[in-house]
A protein has these predicted regions:
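Hydrophobic transmembrane-helix bundles of small-molecule transporters
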Residues: 171-283, 290, 308-309, 316, ...
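A residue-level signal for alpha-helical anchor/packing sites in multi-pass solute transporters
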Residues: 133, 167, 195, 223, ...
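Short, highly charged, low-complexity non-transmembrane loops/tails of multi-pass membrane proteins
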Residues: 467-468
Length: 468
């Protein structure tokens, strides 16, 4: 009698069909956590009315999610290396699903903010595990295609938030933007438990001092950028930023001296000798800056200048979501075949052209249908950047560092998004009439040029020995 081959739970290798099935399970949860970054925006007037919330309280419903999502990422990425990516993903999904239920049931704005904070923490446990697992279960020459699906999900979720949120709020109430996560979360738990294998994990413990230093530094930086524009940049906030800089210096020193102290670094600095990883982490922060910062001026311009309602404005972005989601899987497959810099440079080129078009359209206040041009360009730009950039950044790193690398990569993306929101908001307030919108797009052009320069330095093969 023949024996069934054992499930490959202690190896990083999977049959290709099983790897694709595992990825589809992971993408269900990944879609949810990115959707929840933007879906809440359209419900903010209802929070103000139904929960008797102040403007500052309403802002915190969004801010606290981004804060608790971004701050722990360096740690949660490493937790996947230590305790297993599948285990940490499942824990994160339980936290995210239960806190989503709590959000929908919240009867006061304070309870909603607390539940959103827990939701963000659950998302931080989930996000880095998806990238780590992709790079462990797919062979090297198929990771671009896998990242193509991952990139399609990321782009589609981020862009669909306002549109889907508008429909849900209009027809069934704001509570359902949270309740909808519960059945999807349960499905994700079942699929991941069944289809994602248990992978080998690191044996060393995580350095507690590094955890403290990373949390302080990322919290101080993100909180300062997030709340500075709303609080008017008081002196104590600058003090917090200075403390964050000090904590960051301490964190780097702890990583540098980890071996000497007989412990494992939270972020092995040797990873940054890998040229593609270092450049990719920088370029994805530029993308985070632009994607995170442009949605607000675009939506405000469409509603305040072009006299659209929220749903009409969201529908103008449909070409961006459709093109990005459709294109990313095909671009991912190309990333396995041609030089990595080519696709990323094309993507940043489209993004730069879109920002230039937005600057011109917003400055001149031309007809609303002209906004479809930058929407199409942004769709192509997102489709050409996310998956090639991710695949190239992670492709040559050693397996034992993938969790830490995923944490760094996702942290730089989130910090870029927060920085973009703060910087673009400040530029908009300095302008007069439509010039504020246009000037914010000029800032995006500058940032995108730096991203374009970074990806132009990608190499086809990196020195993996340096990373090892």
């Amino acid at each position: 009698m023949s024996q069934t081959p054992p499930h490959p739970q202690h190896t990083a290798e999977l049959p290709l069909s099983d790897a694709w099935r595992a990825l589809s399970a992971l993408c269900v949860g990944f879609f949810m956590i990115l959707l929840d970054q933007t879906i809440v925006a359209v419900a903010t007037p209802h929070f103000h009315k139904d929960l008797d919330a102040s403007l500052n309280d309403v802002i915190w419903v969004t801010s606290v999610y981004l804060l608790t999502f971004a701050v722990p990422l360096l740690v949660t990425g490493r937790l996947g290396d230590r305790f297993g990516q599948r285990t940490i993903y499942l824990i994160g999904m339980v936290v995210f699903t239960l806190s989503s239920l709590a959000c929908g049931l919240a009867s006061t704005i304070e309870l909603l903010i607390i539940a959103r904070a827990l939701q963000g923490f659950g998302a931080s446990l989930i996000a880095p595990q998806t990238m780590s697992v992709i790079n462990r279960i797919f062979p090297r020459d198929k990771r671009g295609a896998a990242m193509g699906m991952w990139g399609a999900v990321a782009g589609f979720a981020s862009l669909m938030g306002p549109l889907l949120g508008g429909v849900i709020v209009a027809y069934v109430g704001w509570q359902w933007i949270f309740f909808i996560n519960v059945p999807i979360g349960v499905v994700s738990l079942v699929l991941v438990a069944r289809w994602v294998p248990v992978l080998p994990r690191a044996s060393r413990s995580i350095d507690a001092l590094s955890v403290v230093a990373s949390v302080i530094s990322v919290f101080a930086f993100v909180f300062t950028l997030q709340e500075g524009p709303h609080l008017g940049w008081p002196l104590w906030l600058w003090g917090l930023l200075a403390a964050g800089v000090g904590a960051f210096v301490w964190f780097v020193w702890l990583q540098y001296t980890a071996a000497r102290r007989g412990t494992e670094p939270l972020v092995p600095l040797v990873m940054f000798r890998n040229r593609n990883f270092a450049l990719g982490s920088f370029s994805i922060s530029a993308m985070g800056f632009v994607v995170g910062g442009t949605m607000v001026p675009i939506m405000l311009f469409l509603q305040d200048v072009q006299d659209m309602n929220a749903q009409q404005a969201a529908f103008m972005l449909i070409p961006m979501a459709v093109i990005s989601g459709t294109l990313a899987p095909f671009v991912g497959r190309l990333a396995d075949r041609i030089h990595p810099r080519v696709l990323s440079m094309i993507g940043f080129g489209f993004m730069t052209a879109a920002a230039l078009a937005l600057a011109a359209i917003m400055r001149d206040g031309v007809g609303r249908w002209w906004m479809l041009l930058p929407a199409v360009l942004l769709g192509f730009g997102n489709g050409f950047v996310w998956s090639p950039n991710s695949a190239t950044s992670m492709r040559d790193l050693p397996i034992q560092s993938l969790g830490a690398a995923s944490g760094v990569y996702n942290t730089t993306r989130q910090i870029g998004s927060v920085l973009g929101s703060a910087a673009i908001g400040g530029v908009m307030q300095m302008g007069v009439a439509n010039s504020g919108y246009a000037n914010s797009m000029v800032l995006c052009v500058i940032v995108l040029i730096f991203g374009l320069i970074a990806v132009s330095r990608f190499t086809e093969r990196t020195d993996t020995a340096a990373a090892d």
